[in-house]
C-alpha cells in the first residue's frame, strides 16, 4: 500500500512535506496507474517526490528523467530505489535545459503551475499528462465568452490542444489539499508565432477583460510606454467595441499586428 510506504519513508528519514516546495504527495494507486499509462518512450517527470509515480513510469517507459529540486528527496530516491532506466536530476525545473522528450507525466506543484506549463510549451514532446489544481485546469480549457476565459486560456490555445481527462479528490494526496485537482492531457499544436508585442497585447487586454477593446488597451497604455495621447491612435483598432472576453486567439493576433504597426 502506497500510504504505508509513504509514512515508512517519512519516519525513516525524519522528514515531512515541505510547504515551501508545495509538496502534496500523490498516494492514490488508481490515479498513479492512470497517469503512468500515458507515459511512453523517454518521459520527463517534474517533481518526483518520493518516487511513487516514478516507479510506475519506470515499468511502462524506456527511460525516465525525474527532475527534483529538494535535495533531501533526491537522496531518498537514490537510496530507496534501484532504477535501471531512471535518471534523477537535482535541479529547479524552471532552470532545466534538456528539451526533447517523447512524453511528460507529472504531478506538478500548484504554486508554479503557470511557470512550469509555459516552460513546457517551449520544449519538444508528443503529449504531456499533468496534474493541476482543478480551477487552474478549467482556466486552461475555457473558451471565449466563458467566465474562466483568461490570459492563460489564450496562451494555452496558441501553443496546444488540451483536454481534462478526470478530476481527482483531495483524498488522493498526503497531506490533503483544500481543493480538487484535475488531470489534463496536452498535445503541442502551435497556431502561430508570437512576439513581445503580442504578449503585451494579451496582458493589456486581459487586465481589463470586461471592457471593450479600445478602452482596455487605452487603460493599459503604460504597458506600451504610452501616455494619454495614445487614445487618439486607437480609433481604428480592430474589434474596438468588442468585449475582451469574447475575442478568440486569431482576433487577438489581428489586434496585436495592428498595434505593432503603430507602436
Predicted segments, located by residue:
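C-terminal lobe and adjacent flexible extensions of AdoMet/dcAdoMet transferase-like proteins
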Residues: 206-263
Amino acid at each position: 500500500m502506497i500510504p504505508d510506504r509513504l509514512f515508512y519513508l517519512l519516519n525513516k528519514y525524519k522528514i515531512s512535506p515541505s510547504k515551501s516546495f508545495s509538496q502534496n504527495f500523490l498516494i492514490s494507486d488508481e490515479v498513479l496507474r492512470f497517469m503512468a499509462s500515458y507515459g511512453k518512450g523517454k518521459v520527463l517527470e517534474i517533481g518526483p517526490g518520493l518516487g511513487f509515480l516514478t516507479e510506475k513510469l519506470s515499468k511502462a517507459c524506456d527511460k525516465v528523467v525525474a527532475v527534483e529540486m529538494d535535495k533531501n528527496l533526491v537522496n531518498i530516491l537514490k537510496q530507496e530505489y534501484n532504477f535501471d532506466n531512471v535518471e534523477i536530476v537535482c535541479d529547479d525545473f524552471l532552470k532545466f535545459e534538456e528539451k526533447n522528450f517523447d512524453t511528460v507525466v507529472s504531478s506538478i506543484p500548484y504554486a508554479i503551475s503557470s511557470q512550469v506549463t509555459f516552460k513546457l510549451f517551449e520544449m519538444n514532446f508528443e503529449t504531456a499528462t499533468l496534474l493541476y489544481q482543478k480551477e487552474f485546469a478549467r482556466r486552461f480549457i475555457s473558451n471565449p465568452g466563458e467566465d474562466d476565459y483568461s490570459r492563460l486560456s489564450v496562451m494555452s490555445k496558441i501553443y496546444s490542444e488540451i483536454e481534462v481527462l478526470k478530476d481527482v479528490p483531495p483524498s488522493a494526496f498526503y497531506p490533503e489539499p483544500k481543493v480538487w485537482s484535475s488531470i489534463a492531457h496536452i498535445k503541442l499544436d502551435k497556431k502561430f508565432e508570437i512576439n513581445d508585442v503580442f504578449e503585451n497585447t494579451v496582458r493589456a487586454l486581459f487586465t481589463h477583460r470586461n471592457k471593450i477593446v479600445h478602452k482596455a488597451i487605452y487603460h493599459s497604455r503604460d504597458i506600451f510606454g504610452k501616455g494619454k495621447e495614445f487614445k487618439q491612435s486607437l480609433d481604428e483598432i480592430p474589434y474596438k467595441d468588442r468585449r475582451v472576453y469574447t475575442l478568440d486567439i486569431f482576433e487577438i493576433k489581428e489586434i496585436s499586428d495592428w498595434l505593432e504597426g503603430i507602436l
